[in-house]
Amino acid sequence: MTESVFETRKLSDIYDEVREVYLSDNRPWILGFSGGKDSTCMVQLVWNAISDLPENQRQKKIYIISSDTLVESPKIVEQITDTLSKMEKAAKEQNLPISTNLVRPEIKDSFWVCLLGLGYPAPSNNFRWCTDRLKIRNADRFIT
């Protein structure tokens, strides 16, 4: 039998830690959401932890952002947009300080402008220009 290198923790302890960190300062939180299992789990942990706080302690704003790279399948974009909309509605109904935002690259940073217009090579493991231009810059623009 293999022992885990990860500390075994109760879910209630994780919720307590999230609440403690949330209440420790007044800086807003920005959570990246892709719709995958990791970001979905993170949003759910934060959501559940903050929901248990009294309403007068839910003062810090939480922004959930997702990147529309403008090259995703329309079904993927529809799924993310629908999920963000449902989160936004539920946050309002539950009086949570959570808002959702879909960020997109500027035209000059879009995949097709870079690939066809500027002659960038197709992204590869050695040259991943698309991650910065299609996701990171948009999140940075939202933050600032």
Map each language-model feature to its residues:
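ATP-dependent adenylation/nucleotidyltransferase module used to activate substrates
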Residues: M1-T144
